[in-house]
């Protein structure tokens, strides 16, 4: 009874209202509408762009007149997203390419097809394997969608090879997001100097990681109905919509404020933030990178060995 009385204390109502207003005001410190950047003549690739944050980010890039390529696993859902974005933006230069990131054969096929058909890439959201095209198109940006949950992740190289496994699905997610940040920092180090062929050395290929915040996306469909209902009720006040969740992605992809910045982590309010100590450890980053190269069959320069290439 004492607990029930405490929960129904009259101060809970105003405190909850104040907290809700504060959280609502902090949903994003930056709005896409405040950034007038036009991407005409630029090519952008967004993976997982048939729904959620990816689709919202692709829509914003297309709205800015970029040639926007949606890299999706499902042809049907990807085609529907392409048509929706074309109608919403009036930009006919929106296209679908099939990419299943769980299949290295699909990733390699996507990369080869892109290099043959496009050749130039200026914005890459959460993708890999087309770095050469980005170097030739500098200044270019790579945007990796991580999460604030990287703070509790584990940087265990054995997770990559399957020799060991995280304790549960939640820990696996957190560890994956930690590796996103580690790879971002390591890739930024390896891309240093890519701007030397341009007028400004700082305008080469940059790469940054970000957190979209807590977003109500289609990932919730995998949970039971009561969990979905709870998230829906809580989400009215506390969760971001996919559009709001895409703000930090769009910010890192197009904002002039991010020009020349690389190897950094941005929070869901589009502000530079300090990632976890593990995420800032260069030795761990190099170890994870080297282990990943071996697993996907790349050489030390990040290229596929000639013996593996298909004519």
What is the meaning of each model-derived region?
Residues 1-19, 227, 256-311:
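C-terminal tail/cap regions
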Residues 2-10, 24-227, 296-309:
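Rossmann-fold NAD(P)H-dependent dehydrogenase/reductase core
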Residues 17, 22, 53, 236-238:
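Short, positively charged
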Residues 81, 110, 183, 245-249, ...:
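Alpha-helical packing segments of well-folded alpha/beta enzyme cores
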Residues 107, 176, 209, 232-275, ...:
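C-terminal helical subdomain
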